[in-house]
């Protein structure tokens, strides 16, 4: 019984952590993060580092597969961050 209780407690804590990262807009995310994902499941994600997946910045700040790159990096045509 104790094991079931511990497993349930860990599961609830994990779900709370996932929910706390959800976002509706860029304003919901901290510095260095963007709001990205599908219409039904957006999460705050870190800006892309060198070689990581990215999406070019856009005026609407709407991203589906990844965030823009960190400063001094640009998003290449293959959606990977690289030196500008």
Curated annotation (Swiss-Prot):
GO terms for molecular function: toxin activity. Expressed by the venom gland. GO terms for cellular component: extracellular region. Keywords: Disulfide bond, Secreted, Signal, Toxin. Residues 1-21 form the signal peptide. Disulfide bonds join 23-35, 29-44, 34-67, 54-75, 69-81. The keyword Hydrolase does not apply. Gene3D superfamilies: Lipase, subunit A (2.10.80.10). It is found in: Secreted. It holds the Pfam family Prokineticin. It comes from the Eukaryota. The keyword Signal applies. Belongs to the AVIT (prokineticin) family. This is U8-theraphotoxin-Hhn1c 1.
């Amino acid at each position: 019984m104790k094991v079931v209780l511990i497993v349930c407690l860990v599961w609830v804590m994990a779900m709370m952590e996932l929910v706390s990262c959800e976002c509706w807009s860029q304003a919901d995310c901290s510095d260095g993060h963007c709001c990205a994902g599908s219409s039904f499941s957006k999460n705050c994600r870190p800006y892309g580092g060198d070689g990581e997946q990215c999406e070019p910045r856009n005026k609407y700040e709407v991203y589906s597969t990844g965030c823009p790159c960190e400063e001094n990096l640009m998003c290449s045509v293959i959606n990977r961050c690289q030196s500008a």
